[in-house]
Amino acid sequence: MEKVLVTGGAGYIGSHTVLELLEAGYSPVVIDNFHNAIRGEDSMPESLRRVQELTGRSVEFEEMDILDQAALQHLFKKHSFKAVIHFAGLKAVGESVQKPLDYYRVNLTGTIQLLEIMRAHGVKNLVFSSSATVYGNPQYLPLDEAHPTGGCTNPYGKSKFFIEEMIRDLCRADTAWNAVLLRYFNPIGAHASGRIGEDPQGIPNNLMPYVSQVAIGRREALNVFGDDYATEDGTGVRDYIHVVDLAKGHIAALKKLKEQCGCRTYNLGTGTGYSVLQMVQAMEKASGKKIPYKVVARREGDVAACYANPSLAHEELGWTAALGLDRMCEDLWRWQKQNPSGFGAQA
């Protein structure tokens, strides 16, 4: 069984990907520093404890920070990894504007150290979590992989763009490297069991966890940031993708690495954009609850509309998002209902 290192594997996308790795017969080794994960029994992240329960397989986990070089060295000596899936990093757009150095230190330095240690141990296969934020303000829609990158509107997006460039340069300099850069659009939803899902710490930065917390009664009302965008109903349009589809994209990416693919970049999205108000409606339908909202000022750095052309991933990875909006909302609602306080308190 192939050993794959998953950094940041206890988080939202990471934990769903670890589950898919197990289902696909890989042997994942997970590191995480609990920045975005809840500690369960035996110092195991609660998300991964539940992944073990769902799959009946055990997950090897070590608490570790990607900035801790000595610990990473030790890990790579102990295991012989075939590939690395790199999720670890800071990810809140708004916070990145306030704390740019934190974002550059963790995301850039952390990745550089990881790449150096991979190189030293001859592990030259990488899947990287990038983001549609690398496109900046869309010059045209839908966004394909040829759309210019780098006009990012915040340090989070810039950090993802810089890392993409770094990996690209590395693959150019040494053709033994293979990397797949996955540009995520907006992952939502949860595993169909309702046992794992997104559990933001504090006030959610993303729309759907906030909406579902309003539906369950944890929050009063949703703030809609601007209704004067040049979109059909004036609210921001995004490409929402089911987290399970997204996780499966990482399995397809690992297979691609085996073809000695060099550096490849793919959008992971559905190709369909939905507005904030359409998402509120869809969530009202799934939950049977009314979701009160109020319109407030636009948020700095937000673009009017952003959605993918996902056809390259379909052609080259054989991957397509299969789960639609209703399913995303139903699964999100099941998770929220079964875990009203997330992983922290057992429902």
Swiss-Prot record:
Binding site for substrate: 131-133, 184-186, 205-207, 223-225, 238, 299-302
Metabolic or biological pathway, per its Swiss-Prot or TrEMBL entry: Carbohydrate metabolism; galactose metabolism
Pfam family, one: GDP_Man_Dehyd
Alphabetized UniProt keyword annotations: Carbohydrate metabolism, Galactose metabolism, Isomerase, NAD
Recorded catalytic activity of this chain's protein: UDP-alpha-D-glucose = UDP-alpha-D-galactose; UDP-N-acetyl-alpha-D-glucosamine = UDP-N-acetyl-alpha-D-galactosamine
Family: Belongs to the NAD(P)-dependent epimerase/dehydratase family.
Assigned EC number: 5.1.3.2, 5.1.3.7
Residue positions binding NAD(+): 11-13, 32-36, 65-66, 87, 91, 160, 184
Assembly: Homodimer.
Gene Ontology molecular function: protein homodimerization activity; UDP-glucose 4-epimerase activity; UDP-N-acetylglucosamine 4-epimerase activity
Functional note: Catalyzes two distinct but analogous reactions: the reversible epimerization of UDP-glucose to UDP-galactose and the reversible epimerization of UDP-N-acetylglucosamine to UDP-N-acetylgalactosamine. The reaction with UDP-Gal plays a critical role in the Leloir pathway of galactose catabolism in which galactose is converted to the glycolytic intermediate glucose 6-phosphate. It contributes to the catabolism of dietary galactose and enables the endogenous biosynthesis of both UDP-Gal and UDP-GalNAc when exogenous sources are limited.
Top-rank taxon: Eukaryota
Residues annotated as the enzyme's active site: 156
Name under which the protein is recorded: UDP-glucose 4-epimerase
Coiled coil: none
Gene Ontology terms: biological process: galactose catabolic process via UDP-galactose, Leloir pathway; galactose metabolic process; glycolytic process from galactose
Source organism (scientific name): Mus musculus
Family matches, as Gene3D superfamilies: NAD(P)-binding Rossmann-like Domain, UDP-galactose 4-epimerase, domain 1
Cofactor(s) the protein requires to work: NAD(+)
InterPro entries assigned: NAD(P)-bd_dom, NAD(P)-bd_dom_sf, UDP_G4E
